[in-house]
Amino acid sequence: MEKLTILLLVAAVLMSTQALMQEQRQKAKINLFSKRRLSAESWWEENGCSLWGPCTVNAECCSGDCDETCIFGS
């Protein structure tokens, strides 16, 4: 009976360790993608252009193509 109790405790510790490591990996991925998004947003803000917002001239669009709204990918 003692061996079974020890085995169950070891299994519980291993499972909680695995869950903790998996959670840390997910947080690291979220941080990585957040940093990428923020750096892309800051690039657009620094260049003063918009991806798909309203515009009056081509220079307001990152794509350089304005037709009342920025046309992305042209």
From Swiss-Prot:
Coiled-coil ranges from the UniProt annotation: none
Domain remarks: The presence of a 'disulfide through disulfide knot' structurally defines this protein as a knottin. The cysteine framework is VI/VII (C-C-CC-C-C).
Presence of keyword Signal: yes
Entry superkingdom: Eukaryota
Disulfide cysteine pairs (residue numbers): 49-62, 55-66, 61-70
Keyword tags: Cleavage on pair of basic residues, Disulfide bond, Ion channel impairing toxin, Knottin, Secreted, Signal, Toxin
Proregion positions: 20-34
Protein name in UniProt: Conotoxin Vc6.8
